[in-house]
Amino acid sequence: MCAERLGQFMTLALVLATFDPARGTDATNPPEGPQDRSPQQKGRLSLQNTAEIQHCLVNAGDVGCGVFECFENNSSEIRGLHGICMTFLHNAGKFDAQGKSFIKDALKCKAHALRHRFGCISRKCPAIREMVFQLQRECYLKHDLCAAAQENTRVIVEMIHFKDLLLHEPYVDLVNLLLTCGEEVKEAITHSVQVQCEQNWGSLCSILSFCTSAIQRPPTAPPERQPQVDRTKLSRAHHGEAGHHLPEPSSRETGRGAKGERGSKSHPNAHARGRVGGLGAQGPSGSSEWEDEQSEYSDIRR
């Protein structure tokens, strides 16, 4: 449940980070088509920014974080790559040999991909963002981010700061990948981010935790209902038993039945009427049937 809770925080961070996506974008360039400018995808990298980034990429060295710094000040607000690079380099000494190898290879992979792909895509900000995040995922997975995280969990957790998740989308992408690296890594990151959230947001973070737990709590299973067929069978069986256990006739009904049997030798319907009278309720109708039976019996004797 903690992992899902962290997922909610990541979503909130993305929402906060995209409040003003069009700030600083080139407004002089018209859209290529009517469908190209959706409400949250109006941004386009200005020609000046494009030229500056391309020039920066050419002059940036292969070692260090120079390539990522080229994307820090741009009109598409693609930020965070340089911060991730610097964080990895500053903490490289805390990693084991496998972790150091991952940092070196992953950063080199990302820098190489940025150089080769930037000039081949559209100037639309969403396209540039997608390119950046896609190549970042590819490099992390290619050089086995999870293996490095599992062997250096404590260092990885120390590198993740709550404020960066609110400001930089590349951090969110990195954390989402780390959450898939096994239970130990996931639990450690979740606990760290939750503690930092409470330190920064206080009771608001607790409210979010309560809401997410309430939303994701499995519904209480209703009591098992007996199938309709079974209930029908039981109902029929109940009525059948009630039919077999009829009330015992009273002494008056017994005498009337005996007289009915004697009269049935000449009048076959008399016995049937006697039985119906025995099953019926006591009342005015019962006395009238008794009088009819007496008159019929008198006629038979005559």
UniProtKB/Swiss-Prot annotation:
Belongs to the stanniocalcin family. Residues 23-44, 217-302 are annotated as: Disordered. Its main location: secreted. It holds the Pfam family Stanniocalcin. Residues 227-264 have a biased composition (Basic and acidic residues). One of its GO terms (molecular function) is hormone activity. Keywords: Disulfide bond, Glycoprotein, Hormone, Phosphoprotein, Secreted, Signal. PANTHER family: STANNIOCALCIN, STANNIOCALCIN-2. The modification Phosphothreonine is found at T254. The modification Phosphoserine is found at S250, S251. GO terms for biological process: intracellular calcium ion homeostasis. The keyword Glycoprotein applies. InterPro entries: Stanniocalcin. Homodimer; disulfide-linked. Glycans are attached at N73, N74. Residues 1-24 form the signal peptide. One of its GO terms (cellular component) is extracellular space. Has an anti-hypocalcemic action on calcium and phosphate homeostasis. This is Stanniocalcin-2. It is found in: Secreted.
